[in-house]
Amino acid sequence: DYQRIDVFESPEFGKFLTLNGSVIFSEQDCFIYNEMVVHVPMAVHPDVKNVLIIGGGDGGVSKELLQYDNIENIDIVEQDSMFVDVCKEYFPETSIGLDDERVHIYNYDALRFLRSKMNEYDLIINDATDPFGASEGLFTREFYGSCYKALKDDGILVYQHGSPFYDEDEDACRSMHKKVFHTFPISRVYQAHIP
């Protein structure tokens, strides 16, 4: 519907998924990413109950969150329903994180979804792909401002981006950080290397 989705298999990484020719995740190393975007904010925030995941249609982030008993609700806004269907078919060990009764999937534009939310979430995880194509609007000042309004006073936003260690990603990373720092009074960066 919105993007070309392919699933391949390799001896090194097992099955892996691509969107429009770009690798999104593989079954061998997706745990690194999922653990980093979940366990760091959960270690910092004392009482996360209500979570919004933007993207997240593979179920990996919600699967990690569901390990915490205090989680009461997870809203996943994944624009492309076909992405969810493909992940359920080819990555059942990851997509099991979509089957819990606390998880609600909305196939909707994330920016529009956020505009109607105020002071609602303890944690927002932007699990969208890198800032190009259909996800480009999820890396703007308006988007970060909408996230800020949707968070409770002690809420946390976590977002991912390309590696600042690669020249082709460095400028985009800098630009993203400036937008976030402009909106959020307290902003910190942490990194994980994913092969």
Residue ranges and their predicted role:
Residues D1, E120, Q191-P195:
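Short, intrinsically disordered, charge-balanced linker/junction segments flanking boundaries
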Residues D171, S175-P195:
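Class I S-adenosyl-L-methionine
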Residues D130, S163, H193-P195:
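Active-site-proximal loop/turn and secondary-structure-junction residues that shape catalytic pockets
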Residues D1, I24-F25:
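Local beta-strand/beta-hairpin segments that build beta-sheet-rich folds
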